[in-house]
Swiss-Prot record:
Reactions performed catalytically: Release of an N-terminal amino acid, Xaa-|-Yaa-, in which Xaa is preferably Leu, but may be other amino acids including Pro although not Arg or Lys, and Yaa may be Pro. Amino acid amides and methyl esters are also readily hydrolyzed, but rates on arylamides are exceedingly low; Release of an N-terminal amino acid, preferentially leucine, but not glutamic or aspartic acids
Positions of the catalytic residues: K281, R355
InterPro entries listed in its UniProt record: Leucine_aapep/pepB, Macro_dom-like, Peptidase_M17_C, Peptidase_M17_leu_NH2_pept, Peptidase_M17_N
A single Gene Ontology CC term: cytoplasm
Cofactor(s) needed by this chain: Mn(2+)
Keyword list, A-Z: Aminopeptidase, Cytoplasm, Hydrolase, Manganese, Metal-binding, Protease
Protein name: Probable cytosol aminopeptidase
Binding site for Mn(2+) 2: K269, D274, D292, E353
Family per record: Belongs to the peptidase M17 family.
Organism of this sequence: Methylococcus capsulatus (strain ATCC 33009 / NCIMB 11132 / Bath)
Encoding gene, per UniProt annotation: pepA
């Protein structure tokens, strides 16, 4: 998709489709009102005839409009003007782009960003439009044969209508950021949607290495199992023992800041398939465990977005990648392993493996002397039980960091909800035979998982994002979502400001 600004009068505007807004009770937004006057009240008459009230998400596609320069006009309901909030605006955009995609238009011009959405600026409104349009256009066809290929949408260009060139700067910022975030989300979705027999730890490492060749400021390296053994990463290596696929620790280092500025470290769980190990998962929906690497995919996608934007800060991405399968050499319940930090771990459940690969990555992160560390993982089904599939779970040891992530989530609508990690919960992780157990019983499962990780994050500011409920959709719309790329990138944009 191509995005740009367009400064033109309605009389001279030429496009396959012009997208304009209408508020509830058929009150036209400014561009729609001007267009209606140009068409002698046609739009108002059609809204009334078709009983379109202008509720958020209403749409009316008008073909064969007068003048011959504009082929179609898409009227989009925005709801009550005084109640237009983020949720309503996003609903309206999604509805508009669904109709636009199916309209056959190759080129469209949008004026929806002219409406006020709280205190949001033009750059934010443009970003939302691009992210939602790219999400709506996304199609994962890589694993289908040629005979199964359907007809792709014809839409190839979207322009944002401006009253004056003086309005261009924030819109162009929104385009630049929106495209970078959308590209990062697409990369994360593509990696997540690949099957486990294709997207192995080695494949994930190869994709990261390719990314490193695309951007001058990005250096990518991969630690092999022999390197991990030298470092004492016994927890990470133990998870890989049940698989024929060797583990990898992918290191992405983006240097956008001058001098020796400390980096922000993002860690993403990269379990390319999780059968549960000896503590085998139920067969139903086990295919979705290919998504257990979406934390790693999200970190790789976020790093790509940062590199594309050229943000003036340093960012390190760490992706511990492995499979978790049952085998004669796999972890057994009751086994004890020694982590890189020297902490011994009793493995009471081999299906609580994500925290085992993350804890060694957290210890490894210390060598970068980070400003802050954020780990991202599809860690616990308990988080879905607690929060559903709308927000990601947020836990951490630094209030300011957690507040910054919360604000970034509100900005992007990639929201989080903070949960406690009080010392009280640490009691559940006691082991009679090791320093810590890898599970804490059925109560507060997402919290005790974070409490486990917190033991390896005492030397820096740290936050944990449990994306088990947000990284992919199940059911008829099954597929990776690309979250939390928008959240992570917004957090870094805010730090670079």
């Amino acid at each position: 998709m191509e995005y740009s600004t367009r400064t033109d009068t309605l009389e001279r505007l030429s496009t396959d489709c012009l997208i304009v807004g209408v508020f509830q009770k058929r009150k036209l937004a400014p561009t729609a009102e001007a267009l209606d006057a140009l068409f002698d009240g046609l739009l108002a008459r059609l809204l009334k005839r078709d009983d379109v009230e202008g509720k958020a998400g209403d749409t009316l596609l008008v073909n064969h409009v007068p003048g011959g320069r504009i082929d179609r006009v898409l009227l989009v309901g925005l709801g009550k003007r005084e109640e237009l909030n983020v949720a309503a605006y996003r609903k309206s955009l999604a509805a508009a782009f669904k109709v636009l995609k199916e309209s056959g238009a190759k080129h469209a011009v949008s004026a929806l960003h002219e409406v006020e959405v709280g205190q949001r600026g033009a750059d934010w409104k443009i970003r939302q439009a691009i992210e939602l349009l790219e999400s709506g256009l996304y199609r994962f066809q890589e694993m289908k044969g040629a005979s199964a290929e359907d007809h792709p949408p014809r839409l190839s260009r979207l322009q944002f209508l401006l009253a004056s060139d003086q309005d261009a700067a924030p819109v162009e910022t929104g385009i630049r950021e929106g495209q970078a975030i959308a590209h990062g989300m697409t990369l994360a979705r593509n990696l997540g949607n690949l099957p486990g027999n294709v997207c192995t730890p080695a494949y994930l490492a190869e994709q990261a290495l390719k990314l490193g060749k695309e951007y001058k400021k990005l250096k990518v390296s991969v630690l092999e199992e022999s390197d991990m053994e030298e470092l004492g990463m016994g927890a990470l290596l133990s998870v890989a023992r049940g698989s024929r696929q060797p583990a990898k620790l992918i290191v992405l280092e983006y240097r956008g800041a001058a001098g020796k500025a400390k980096p922000y470290v993002l860690i993403g769980k990269g379990l390319t398939f999780d059968a549960g190990g000896i503590s085998l998962k139920p067969a139903a929906n086990m295919d979705e465990m290919k998504y257990d690497m979406c934390g790693g995919a999200g970190v790789i996608g976020a790093i790509q977005a940062v590199a594309e934007m050229g943000l003036p800060l340093n960012v390190v991405g760490l992706v511990p990648a492995s499979e978790n399968l049952p085998d004669g050499n796999a972890n057994k319940p009751g086994d004890i392993v020694r982590s890189m930090a020297g902490i011994t771990i009793e493995i009471l459940n081999t299906d609580a493996e994500g925290r085992l690969i993350l804890c060694d990555a957290l210890t490894y992160a210390k060598r970068f002397d980070p400003v802050a560390v954020i780990d991202v993982a599809t860690l616990t089904g308990a988080c879905i039980v607690a929060l559903g599939r709308h927000p990601s779970g947020l836990m951490g040891n630094d209030d300011a960091l957690c507040e910054q992530l919360t604000r970034a989530g509100e900005t992007t609508w990639d929201r989080v909800w903070r949960m406690p990690i009080w010392d009280d919960y640490q009691e559940q992780l006691k082991s009679n035979f090791a320093d810590v157990a890898n599970i804490g019983g059925p109560d507060g499962g997402s919290i005790t998982a974070a409490c486990f990780l917190s033991r390896f994050a005492k030397d820096f500011k740290w936050a944990h994002l449990d994306i088990a409920g947000t990284a992919w959709k199940t059911g008829a719309d099954k597929g990776a979502t690309g979250r939390p790329v928008p959240l992570l990138v917004q957090y870094l944009i805010d730090r670079a400001a």
